[in-house]
Amino acid sequence: MRSEIIRVRTGGREAVHDITAECAEFARDASGGGDGLLHVFVPHATAGVALIELGAGSDDDLLAALRDLLPADNRWEHAHGSLGHGRSHVLPAFIAPYASVPVLGGRLALGTWQSIAMVDLNVDNPDRQVRLSFLG
């Protein structure tokens, strides 16, 4: 297995950050043009990984849906940090902190409109890590 960490800077705001290019480059290099499985994992208790269409408004729609589902207010028992920080600790129950994508011939076998995104509602932690692992 080959594994490495990429760093993502969300800028201290809610974010759906596209990491597809980084994942594709890693998969190409790690696979040597062969087949296998890319596993994407966010080692944080307040972020997730989504396979979603990006750039056509879906990323904004996802953030809007999460704001409706997980409001940034004082209802949360886990109540340190910024207002609504507790919702970030609930996020991984809805958007898992991992995803696996087939790699065929060194290329990610994503659907036409699929991208790989790190989803982060935690405005208190603008610097994130994503672990990419290739099994082949």
Predicted regions and their residues:
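Active-site histidine-anchored catalytic micro-motif
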Residues: 1-136
